[in-house]
Design a protein with these regions (language model features):
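Extracellular glycan-modifying ectodomains
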Residues: 2-389
Length: 389
């Protein structure tokens, strides 16, 4: 009888000990990283790989008392110890075992090509690729009315207004997209809409056909980045030049040089920039060597810049666009006496009065549907929108 009680006691003690060990291990897993992290933090990768600002520590005040719990949770989630280390480990496992990305906005394609397949209201690259977001007749009418209104008002101010649409990378290099991502229909949203808008006499131009002509001969987009490279942007710049000035420079007239290895923003989003760095950075050389362009003004983040040149064309160009407009800075300033670049984060109508451009280029990449559709609001706004985050 006593032996049974002793055995039962030993079993209970063993079970209790096991529970204590598990609880202790769990508590240690929560506490130890926080305790150890300050000592090793300087030796770890702390870079922000997300396309947003990380949450800041909440304001500890009576006025902000109700918001402190949720703001602290957001702060802790963004700054949790060893976050990049754990994210990188999970990403590697997902890529090696499943050939999938742990980041929903990044699709891993064939030969490790990375694609930005964001799927949000106003910016739905996945729907663009799958062709599931075609415009309705009413939407196309509203879009045509908005572009017509902007164009007419620009003409009244003596400005030539043109809109260019740069294709998403997967629209040019669809052969590298995974077969599991199905495509429905024969035309994308812009494949269907842009010819109709152009047929109405509206100054809307599709850059995809010109890029597709060279896509098999040259690599026009970065492998691990969502943007076109210098070769792709050169082709885009010459389409703009041909449209506005009636002249352009063919690829055969410039030199294309490999300037070293390249990674990209999509690799950084996966926290795999070091592993995905075998792409090539191409540089265009000997473009209009007889013209010299210099930077006369540029803000800290390069979202606003002014160039002057000794071009025989004494006109002023204003380029307003998303991140795809950035690489045009290598080429467009040589075509005008003055060229002003402003991203959508810096542009306001006041720039029209300040610089009085002769030509106005409004450039968006295919996925930036909202900025394409809201052209009338964007062009005439009097203040810069606040950034998220």
């Amino acid at each position: 009888m006593d032996s049974c009680r002793e055995k039962k006691t030993r079993d209970m003690n063993r079970e209790t000990g096991t529970k204590i060990l598990l609880i202790g291990s769990f508590a240690a897993s929560l506490v130890l990283p926080t305790l150890v992290y300050p000592a090793v933090r300087s030796h770890l990768d702390q870079q922000n790989y997300e396309n947003r600002e990380l949450a800041s520590f909440p304001e500890l005040s009576a006025a902000n008392f109700d918001n402190i719990p949720t703001e602290f949770e957001a702060y802790y989630n963004d700054h949790v110890p060893f976050k990049n280390l754990f994210v990188k480990a999970k990403t590697k496992l997902d890529l090696e075992l499943l050939n999938e990305s742990s980041i929903s906005d990044v699709t891993v394609g064939k030969e490790n090509w990375l694609f930005y397949t964001v799927s949000e209201d106003g910016e739905d690259a996945l729907a663009d690729y799958q062709r599931t977001n075609l415009y309705t007749a009413d939407e196309k009418t509203a879009l045509a009315d908005a572009i017509t209104s902007v164009n007419e008002k620009m003409k009244e101010r003596g400005i030539r207004f043109v809109m260019f649409e740069a294709p998403n990378k997967e629209s040019v290099y669809a052969e590298y997209m995974p077969d599991s991502v199905r495509v429905y229909g024969s035309e994308s949203r812009l494949d269907a809409a842009l010819p109709e808008l152009a047929a109405q006499g509206l100054p809307v131009y599709d850059m995809k056909p010109e890029l597709l002509k060279e896509a098999d001969t040259y690599q026009l987009y970065y492998k691990y980045d969502t943007h076109w490279n210098q070769i792709g942007s050169f082709i885009g710049s010459q389409q703009i030049a041909q449209t506005l000035l009636g002249t352009s420079t063919p690829l055969s007239a410039v030199s294309i040089e490999a300037a070293g290895p390249a990674s990209g923003d999509l690799a950084r989003m996966l926290n795999m920039a070091a592993e995905y760095s075998d792409d090539t950075e191409y540089v265009i050389q000997n473009y209009l060597p007889e013209v010299t362009a210099t930077t006369v003004d540029m803000n800290e983040d390069n979202s606003f810049a002014v160039f002057e040149s000794d071009s025989p064309n004494d006109k002023t160009l204003l380029v307003v666009g998303d991140s795809f407009s950035q690489n045009l800075k290598y080429f467009m300033p040589k075509l005008y006496r003055k060229t002003v670049f402003a991203t959508f984060d810096t542009y306001t109508e006041a720039l029209l009065d300040e610089y009085q451009p002769d030509d106005f280029v409004y450039l968006t990449v295919e996925r930036n549907q909202e900025l394409f559709e809201d052209v009338e609001t964007v062009v005439w706004r009097d203040e810069v929108p606040e950034k998220d985050g």
